[in-house]
């Protein structure tokens, strides 16, 4: 039992005991006949049980609710070259989801919701949002949507310090685009970023935790590089 739970439990006990003492003092239990004494004790017991049920069903889940947060940095392990069986070495970028609450969160999904392009490369440039962009599920790392679509889209995240990684996108060797890592995508809309500065919005939803939304600025030089320092310089991603 956490300190917060202990405080709530103590508060409930004090409420019941305080109410009992108040009525005992006000009505002098010695002057009440036996039948009324029994009824009074039953009433106090009922109130106490009701408060405990409210605590168990409402207050305790609220105290112990999951709390998810997004972590990212433009360095390993969030951004790195993949080790594959082939000679190709795609460069992947992920963010991490951590549950800092007290209970697990079910059906956690990450959704790419909005995309903007920068009108120019200046610091104070305006952003032009992609029109009619349809939100898409990003893929949880190390999952293959062709083998198990549900596992690729939805994740159970347990409380603690463990980081659950979700893919943002990748750059393939000898390619000049930053491709979003989507579980499924629409053929009617673009699923990659070309050279330049862009901004994206990602939200993480779940069955029993509050939605978390973050924006990322992606500054992409348009050329895959073979070393980590070169890629960190050529593909700069900042979480706002």
Locations of regions flagged by a protein language model:
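Residue-level recognition of well-ordered beta-strand positions that form the cores
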Residues: 94-98, 111-113, 201-205
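Short, hydrophobic/aromatic beta-strand segments
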Residues: 103-112, 121-125
């Amino acid at each position: 039992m956490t300190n917060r739970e202990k405080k709530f439990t103590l508060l409930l006990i004090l409420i019941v005991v305080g109410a009992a003492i108040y009525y005992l003092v006000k009505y002098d239990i010695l002057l009440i006949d036996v039948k009324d004494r029994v009824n009074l004790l039953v009433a106090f017991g009922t109130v106490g049980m009701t408060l405990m049920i409210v605590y168990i069903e409402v207050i305790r889940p609220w105290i112990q609710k999951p709390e998810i947060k997004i972590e990212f940095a433009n360095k390993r392990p969030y951004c790195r070259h993949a080790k594959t069986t082939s000679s190709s070495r795609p460069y992947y970028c992920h963010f991490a989801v951590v549950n800092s609450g007290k209970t697990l969160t079910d059906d956690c999904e990450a959704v790419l919701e909005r995309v903007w392009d920068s009108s120019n490369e200046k610091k104070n440039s305006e952003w032009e949002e992609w029109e009619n962009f349809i939100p898409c599920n990003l893929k949880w790392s190390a999952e293959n949507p062709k083998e198990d679509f549900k596992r690729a889209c939805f994740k159970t995240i347990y409380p603690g310090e463990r980081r659950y990684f979700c893919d943002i996108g990748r750059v393939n060797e000898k390619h000049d685009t930053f491709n979003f890592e989507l579980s499924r995508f629409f053929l009617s809309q673009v699923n990659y970023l070309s050279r330049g500065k862009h901004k994206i919005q990602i939200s993480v939803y779940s069955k029993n935790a509050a939605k978390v939304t973050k924006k990322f600025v992606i500054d992409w030089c348009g050329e895959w590089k073979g070393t980590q320092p070169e890629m960190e310089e050529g593909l700069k991603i900042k979480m706002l």
